[in-house]
Amino acid sequence: MAGEVYLLWLLPLLQGLASYGAELSSEACRELGFSSNLLCSSCELLGQFSLNQLDLPCRQCCQEEAQLENRKLYPGAILEVCGUKLGRFPQVQAFVRSDKPKLFRGLQIKYVRGSDPVLKLLDDNGNIAEELSILKWNTDSVEEFLSEKLERI
């Protein structure tokens, strides 16, 4: 019952945002409960769960698979983690504490109190271009992703 009330409250908000017709910012998508690495193919599954009303905002927050395959190199990245929570993410911990971060030009490890593991890719001006949660990534996935997105030393 509470979920239905929440959904009824959320729908007008989503419809209002959808009226703008453009992609939503990563912050707006996160506030709506969408992951920063949401694939558009996931939006196609909403109908199976009678969630068609979420289709439009989902499509405004998703990334096309082909778009993900672009080989754009970023000049830098920040991997944010909380030192006290790092033990809960052993794969990320293994990457951070190894010599692997030194292999990537422009990669900074930043310890932010309370932060779950997040990877922020920076544009030429040092602004955040993409932000990805890496909670469930293993060491090889982090290294492979950074190999595709950053220049190796």
Curated annotation (Swiss-Prot):
Xref: Gene3D superfamilies: Sep15/SelM thioredoxin-like domain, active-site redox motif
SUPFAM superfamilies reported in the protein's UniProt record: Thioredoxin-like
Signal peptide coordinates: 1-19
Subcellular location per the Swiss-Prot or TrEMBL entry: Endoplasmic reticulum lumen
A Pfam family of this chain: Sep15_SelM
GO molecular function: oxidoreductase activity; selenium binding
InterPro entries in alphabetical order: Sep15/SelM_sf, Sep15_SelM, Sep15_SelM_dom, Thioredoxin-like_sf
A single GO cellular-component term on record: endoplasmic reticulum lumen
Stretches assigned to coiled coil: none
Keywords attached to this entry: Endoplasmic reticulum, Selenocysteine, Signal
Tissue specificity remark: Higher levels in polster, prechordal plate, axis, otic vesicle and somites. Lower levels in fin buds.
Job description of the protein: May be involved in redox reactions associated with the formation of disulfide bonds. May contribute to the quality control of protein folding in the endoplasmic reticulum.
Protein family membership: Belongs to the selenoprotein M/F family.
Stated name of the protein: Selenoprotein F
Organism listed in the record: Danio rerio
Gene name, Swiss-Prot/TrEMBL: selenof
